[in-house]
């Protein structure tokens, strides 16, 4: 398992990529706090959250409020992620565990997890809002160091293949 984190300015572009049914054979396998009618309503849900004021009543002005995490698993673990409900559920569980390992409460965070089938290795895309449901900002301080540790713990816990990252 390898997770690559990118910061984004705009929700609509990354939502359209993550949930690209035509080119990526994508399907949503997990979410919280977003309307899943279509990509536009997903993006609008994220955008609305940016208007939640902080504890002092001020709006946040993050230059990059969007986090996009590409979570890839080893081809050796493909049998752990069958193309069915069980495989989707397990992959979504691991993405939610990644959030927790990063110190992010999935119950207090808007996110969507989309599974892709355009590569030989199992993978998904996690898009989340840096403005939590309670109006606080989700820290991205030391996220690369925390990410490495989170992936290592999840791989150990679930006996996933270790490889070069």
Predicted regions and their residues:
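N-terminal nicking endonuclease/strand-transfer module with a His-rich metal-binding environment
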Residues: 1-165
């Amino acid at each position: 398992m390898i997770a690559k984190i990118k910061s984004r300015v705009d929700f609509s572009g990354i939502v359209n990529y993550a949930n690209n049914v035509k080119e990526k054979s994508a399907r949503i396998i997990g979410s919280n706090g977003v309307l899943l009618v279509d990509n536009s309503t997903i993006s609008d849900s994220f955008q609305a959250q940016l208007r939640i004021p902080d504890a002092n009543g001020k709006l946040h002005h993050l230059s990059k409020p969007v986090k996009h995490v590409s979570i890839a698993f080893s081809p050796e673990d493909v049998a752990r992620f069958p193309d069915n409900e069980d495989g989707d559920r397990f992959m979504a569980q691991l993405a939610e565990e990644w959030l927790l390992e990063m110190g992010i409460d999935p119950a207090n965070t808007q996110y969507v997890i989309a599974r892709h089938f355009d590569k030989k290795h199992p993978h998904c895309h996690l898009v989340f809002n840096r403005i939590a449901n309670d109006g606080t900002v989700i820290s991205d301080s030391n996220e690369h160091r925390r990410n490495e540790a989170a992936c290592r713990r999840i791989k150990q816990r679930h006996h996933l293949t270790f490889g070069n990252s």
